[in-house]
Amino acid sequence: MKREKGRRGKKRICNFCVDKAEVVDYKDVQRLKKYITERGKILPRRISGNCAKHQRLLTTAIKRARNIALLPFTAE
């Protein structure tokens, strides 16, 4: 059997780079919710399309928001 080659999806553009955002605000809950699954997990870079720098900042912001109870740790 031949093995099919994997599909390459469309290259996604980092939304934070487009907006020229220097920081990711942990208080901006509506924006952070876009990068969390319905189970409460943080979306990976290959799915969200963020660059490495902003993915790191986003992860830190989500964890801060969880610690001060702005975002849930798990699904509701």
UniProtKB/Swiss-Prot annotation:
SUPFAM superfamilies: Ribosomal protein S18. Keywords: Ribonucleoprotein, Ribosomal protein, RNA-binding, rRNA-binding. GO terms for molecular function: small ribosomal subunit rRNA binding; structural constituent of ribosome. The keyword Ribosomal protein applies. One of its GO terms (cellular component) is cytosolic small ribosomal subunit. Disulfide bonds: none annotated. InterPro entries: Ribosomal_bS18, Ribosomal_bS18_CS, Ribosomal_bS18_sf. One of its GO terms (biological process) is translation. The keyword RNA-binding applies. Pfam families: Ribosomal_S18. NCBIfam families: S18. Binds as a heterodimer with protein bS6 to the central domain of the 16S rRNA, where it helps stabilize the platform of the 30S subunit. Part of the 30S ribosomal subunit. Forms a tight heterodimer with protein bS6. Belongs to the bacterial ribosomal protein bS18 family. This is Small ribosomal subunit protein bS18. It comes from Pelotomaculum thermopropionicum (strain DSM 13744 / JCM 10971 / SI).
